[in-house]
């Protein structure tokens, strides 16, 4: 498996490098603009290592990936690793926040749907979860901004406030994006939770617990959810 993984990574790196190479355009000319002098473009190519043979550039690129040197962004002209580090302090808390929200929403919804299997409430919940899966994140995010930031003014529509002003304000800035990301995940998790609980409720030990006089609610909480 290790050998297979190694060759898979090598093959993937070759495909990525070749794909970047065949894209039309010259990075040096793009960075300097269309009015750049030829000698300036040549100097920048040398600085970026674009004047070297493709195989040598591939080896340099792979070595940089292994040691965490991702080069310089052609658009922002800054080291990529620094840009990733700056954005990681926002993206990682946002991902964790969205994961927590999706779990908090999905568990009770899935349990409630399983407890009311075959009833109107169950069909309604499953219908809403299907809508949650189908709604695009960006459209739902715009709807949240319009409702809670523009109309109700509960949140700011100005983007991330930063962690410098406190964790509470930072989390408040991430709330709407986290909800937009959490909705489809919560919908999927709720459906999975419902299906799993329905399977568990049909097991023999659950039937035995009910036959011994344990109420459905207690059987669900003590044995089903566990």
PLM features per residue range, with description:
Residues 5, 87, 91, 127-130, ...:
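Residue-level signal for discrete positions within transmembrane alpha-helices
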Residues 8-59, 152-173:
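Hydrophobic alpha-helical transmembrane segments of membrane transport/permease proteins
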Residues 16, 20, 24, 28, ...:
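Membrane-water interface at transmembrane helix exits
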Residues 33, 43-46, 60, 64, ...:
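Short amphipathic alpha-helical coupling elements at transmembrane boundaries
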Residues 51-107:
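An internal, D/E-rich "acidic patch" concept
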Residues 88-122, 137, 150, 164-226:
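Alpha-helical transmembrane segments of integral membrane proteins
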């Amino acid at each position: 498996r290790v050998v297979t993984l190694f060759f898979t990574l090598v093959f993937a790196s070759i495909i990525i490098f070749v794909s970047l190479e065949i894209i039309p355009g010259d990075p040096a000319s793009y960075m300097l603009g269309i009015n750049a002098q030829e000698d300036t473009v040549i100097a920048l190519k040398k600085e970026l290592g674009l004047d070297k043979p493709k195989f040598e550039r591939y080896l340099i690129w792979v070595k940089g990936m292994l040691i965490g040197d991702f080069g310089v962004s052609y658009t922002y002209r800054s080291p990529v690793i620094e840009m990733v580090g700056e954005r990681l302090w926002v993206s990682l808390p946002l991902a964790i926040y969205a994961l927590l929200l999706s779990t908090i929403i999905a568990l009770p919804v899935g349990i409630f749907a399983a407890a009311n299997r075959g009833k109107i409430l169950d069909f309604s919940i499953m219908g809403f979860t299907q809508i949650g899966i189908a709604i695009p994140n960006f459209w739902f995010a715009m709807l949240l901004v319009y409702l809670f930031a523009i109309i109700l003014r509960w949140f700011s529509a100005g983007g991330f406030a930063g962690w410098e002003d406190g964790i509470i304000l930072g989390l408040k800035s991430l709330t709407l994006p986290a909800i937009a990301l959490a909705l489809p995940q919560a919908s999927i998790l709720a459906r999975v939770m419902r299906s799993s609980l329905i399977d568990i409720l049909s097991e023999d030990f659950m039937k035995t617990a009910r036959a011994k006089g344990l109420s459905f609610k207690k059987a669900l909480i003590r044995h089903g959810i566990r």
